[in-house]
A protein has these predicted regions:
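A short, flexible beta-alpha/helix-coil linker loop
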Residues: 27-31, 97-100, 156-160
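ATP-dependent carboxylate activation and anion-phosphoryl transfer catalytic cores
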Residues: 1-67
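Hydrophobic/aromatic beta-strand patches that form the interior of the parallel beta-sheet core
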Residues: 22, 64, 91, 149-151, ...
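Short coil/turn connectors at secondary-structure junctions
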Residues: 17-18, 58-62, 85-89, 123-126, ...
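Flexible active-site lid/hinge loop adjacent to a nucleotide/diphosphate
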Residues: 104-188
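Glycine-rich nucleotide phosphate-binding loop and flanking beta-alpha elements
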Residues: 9, 28, 72, 135-136, ...
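Short, well-ordered alpha-helices that flank and scaffold nucleotide-derived cofactor binding pockets
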Residues: 50, 81-85, 121
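Walker A (P-loop) phosphate-binding motif
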Residues: 55-101
């Protein structure tokens, strides 16, 4: 078997060169174990996954999700910076961009579920800071099942009348989704 690893400079960290594993080659292959011409089939794929991600270990990227009417982008930038200074590779979404490890990957309003999935699919990210706005939640949901930390900053009338949300109570119901899907700490 072999592991194929791509990098521009093998003497440097993969984080500096954007290197990474592109393929794991099992030898002599899995098919002979999964569908043998003789004998009992074996779930070797499951055994490989159990070795890579042992049962009971954390395989999910920790998520901090922020929502509110005002201050989401500022707070998400601040949290992303704190986490980066603590040594993490941060994936962040905001009304400005998707940012991975301090590098802008996509510009524009990236507060919806598609951008959240972009961050969570990036193999270099080890913590996510996701700004989640009313529009994305109403149109398409969150882009993640749960978060570890959720923050609902405020609910004010600034964005009423958009996307079928016409009252403060209605806006609060949309924003409280973040508190409801938080498995750890909720900041109100």
């Amino acid at each position: 078997g072999a592991v194929d690893f791509l990098t521009t400079d093998i003497t440097k960290s993969y984080r500096e060169t954007d290197g990474g594993i592109c393929e794991v080659n099992a030898g002599p292959g899995l098919r002979m174990h999964i569908a043998p011409s003789e004998g009992t089939p074996r779930d070797v794929g499951g055994a490989i996954m159990d070795m890579l991600f042992p049962p009971g270990t954390q395989a999910r990227v920790p998520i901090a999700a922020l929502t509110g009417t005002n201050g989401k982008t500022t707070c998400s930038r601040m949290l992303a910076h704190i986490l980066k200074m603590a040594g993490h590779v941060v994936g962040q979404t905001s009304t400005d961009a998707v940012v991975i490890d301090g590098n802008v990957t996509v510009k524009g309003d990236m507060t919806g579920p598609v951008s959240a999935k972009m961050v969570l699919r990036d193999p270099s990210v080890d913590v996510a800071v996701l700004e989640t706005a009313r529009g994305g939640i109403v149109r398409s949901g969150l882009g993640f099942n749960f978060c570890d930390v959720g923050a609902v900053l405020n609910v004010t009338s600034d964005h009423l009348g958009l996307g079928g949300v016409d009252t403060i109570d209605g806006l609060a119901r949309v924003k409280r989704v973040i508190a409801e899907v938080t498995r750890g700490t909720v900041v109100l």
